């Protein structure tokens, strides 16, 4: 029934591109509301019941919550554990809110499966990419990724963000980095891998990135970190600190297999 109130949702903006609305991907260094994490539990990724991983995640959550909000997703099985952790951390010291919510995922990589946020300077919207576990049936890291693939729109709708639907274009958050002023970086080894968008050319992928991220320039690095199982995500090897300045992982050891890559 038409209530007379016009709403904007992902269905209405599915055929509209962020760049057409004046949206861009901000730099990581820009002020933002908070950080999304997923509580680890997948046995194939986290040994010993994820005990050591959970200790490390707790340290990261504490560090982030000192300066911004944390949105912590946990499965129904681990929600109570994650909630108790959040309560303990916030009791021990003055922190920003740690908001624990239930979400079923296949693993704990929020950076890759979560929404990419874009802004026009006033409003923030999300982008939902296709996720296929870093390579799908070609060289993906696990056989079932349907829960991960639903996480981005779930989070956007839960938090009230309008979101653009970029599917079936496959992309992970860690595979792209922005300077916030129209330049993004990616690696050829990842975005041109056979398990992601094999039917698209480099030029076509470049245009996709410009259209969805509001970019004017796409920097293609040939490789990333040696043996990175994500097909060498750019965020592991190079990241913008500010426009015109990057931090780079490299080695001076000519015998190291990373030497020719960076």
Regions found by a protein language model. Give the residues of each.
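The feature marks the mature, well-folded catalytic cores of soluble enzymes
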Residues: 2-262
